[in-house]
Amino acid sequence: AQSVVDLGCGMGSYVRHFSREGLRAIGLDGNPSTPQLSKGACGVLDLSVIAEVAEPCDWVLSLEVGEHLPKVYEAAFMENLNRFNTQGMVLSWALEGQGGTGHVNEQSNDYIKAKICALGYVNDANAEASLRQAAQFAYFKRTIMVFRRTAWQDGMTQG
């Protein structure tokens, strides 16, 4: 991968890390204070509204974001995950009953996997297992999921 977008980037920690590693990294978050919180590294995007994406990245990263959006916005959020990548996504979504500040749409891994795979992805179980094993936070050991595109759409080319 040469580029990644972090949807729901918070303070931009992953964006700064990926940039230091030589990737083109973009961070977007629904919080209007994101530019200040990220020291100018990231921008603002309402992830509950389907975005027009001029230049998608190779991969999307979105960790513990979907559960903060009411279910009515779930499909739009997932479409944004889809539109912002050309190769795949690394996603985590709080599990039902996990609990957490602002969690309004916790879902099972199976539910999320079915929804994302219906958009034209396959679950990369090997990459997922590697990331879960390496995860520092206990909840990531249960919630990290990896998806790869199965088909290229509208002139997208494999990078």
Predicted segments with their positions:
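Conserved SAM-binding loop
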Residues: 2-97, 110-113, 148-149
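A generic fold-level signal
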Residues: 37, 139-140
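Phosphate/oxyanion-binding loops and surfaces in catalytic or ligand/nucleic-acid-binding neighborhoods
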Residues: 84, 118-122, 147-153
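C-terminal alpha-helical "lid/dimerization" subdomain adjacent to the S-adenosyl-L-methionine
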Residues: 94-102, 124
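Short alpha-helix
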Residues: 105-120
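Conserved S-adenosyl-L-methionine
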Residues: 121-132
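Flexible, glycine-/basic-rich loop-and-beta segments that form/coincide
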Residues: 141-159
